[in-house]
C-alpha cells in the first residue's frame, strides 16, 4: 500500500464513520468534487497536504488525528 492509497482509504473510512458522502465532504471542506474524486479514484497519486488539511478542517479533526490510524503505521517505506 502506498501513502496515496492510505490517504484514500482513510478518507473513505472517515466518511463512513460520519455517514457522509464524498459529495457532502467536498461541500463541507470547500474543495471541488473533482478534486476529491481524483483522490478517491486514484487520479491523484500524491494528494497535497493543503487538500488533506482542508478535509481535516471540514471533519473537525487535526492532521495528527487524520494520520493517527493503523493504515499509516502499516505503510512500507516508499522509495522513488
Show where each model-derived region lies:
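Short, charged recognition helix plus adjacent turn
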Residues: 1, 38, 45, 67-80
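A short, Lys/Arg-rich alpha-helix, primarily the initiator
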Residues: 1-20
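Residues within the helices of the helix-turn-helix
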Residues: 12, 23, 53
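Residues in the recognition helix of alpha-helical DNA-binding motifs
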Residues: 14, 28, 39, 69
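The alpha-helix within a helix-turn-helix
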Residues: 15, 26, 56
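Short alpha-helical DNA-recognition segment
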Residues: 19-38
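Short, basic-rich loop-to-helix N-cap that marks the start of a DNA-contacting helix
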Residues: 43-57
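Intrinsically disordered, low-complexity basic tails/linkers immediately adjacent to helix-turn-helix/homeobox/MYB/SANT
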Residues: 57-65
